[in-house]
UniProtKB/Swiss-Prot annotation:
This is Putative phosphatidate phosphatase. The gene is wun. It comes from Drosophila melanogaster (Fruit fly). Residues 35-53 have a biased composition (Low complexity). Homodimer. This complex seems not to be involved in substrate recognition, it may confer only structural or functional stability. The keyword Transmembrane helix applies. Glycans are attached at N51, N169.
Amino acid sequence: MPAVKIIMSTETSASETTPLRRSENETPDHKELAQSNSNSRQTTVNSNNNNYSNSVQVRLQEQDRDSDSEQQQHTATITMDTNKRILCRVGLDVLILLCAGFPILLFFLLGEPYKRGFFCDDESLKHPFHDSTVRNWMLYFIGAVIPVGVIFIVEVIISQNKAKQDNGNATSRRYVFMNYELPDWMIECYKKIGIYAFGAVLSQLTTDIAKYSIGRLRPHFIAVCQPQMADGSTCDDAINAGKYIQEFTCKGVGSSARMLKEMRLSFPSGHSSFTFFAMVYLALYLQARMTWRGSKLLRHLLQFLFIMVAWYTALSRVSDYKHHWSDVLAGSLIGSISALVVANYVSDLFQKPNTKPYLARTVQDMNASPAQAITITTN
């Protein structure tokens, strides 16, 4: 019996060491298991985070592309609107200028001056015919080439001086049309020359209306017309002395049809009105725009020379027997008053600085808020 007990005890002892029960050396470490599980969960989380991050980046890139596309479309739309606005403004200016100048062409081609009578013994109508001292090409040079050239030179110099002062960073010099940045001098020349041309056309139209409405005879009327009365008599016959002659025809030997028409257009003087408008306006322009620290007298000398050009032109019309002195005076007043009105009330030469831009600027300026908008001062 005791032996049996020993055997059973041995079996029991052996059963405790069977492979079905792991020994302490073979038991896994709980820390390693926890670490492994933690690493597995971390890998899963990192994978999920990477997938989410990639998804967010893709969405952001798509949003950026959409935003860039919308911005480009918006920019293109604003650019097209800006170009259209500039074209409409320029086209409207040209149309208005043509409308104002068209009646002058009609007067020249189709206009008929008022038929005024005369006295055969009127000494003011018996002067000989002379060619003009100031020819037409000289008149056009005085009234067109000189003002345009002076305005161009002054505006270019002003623009260069501004560029030097601003070191190329001046925002007021940015004008964009058809994706081309227009310089400031070009815009200013367009404004100044356009307004000058508008004023010159109106001054000439005012003069022509008076010419064709009054029909005053020129001092060389008798020499050019060589009038013959209905009964065949002339001014050399005594029966016509002291008579006011209304019914007559012009023999006009050696006179062209244009000369026979021009002999009735004495009042007011067109040469005087045109040159005085051009030179007075140019003097006012220099007063407002020309600033040279070298010598203040240079500006006033140029102004004096320009006025003297107009003064000489007006005097030559009397000495050439093209006009009576009152015709020249009236023409000079029309031109001078027109220049004063245009310079002070039509142009911006003497206006206070204005913060409203004349032309549309860049796309950034179009999108800028009122507080951030770039303003331009015109002077």
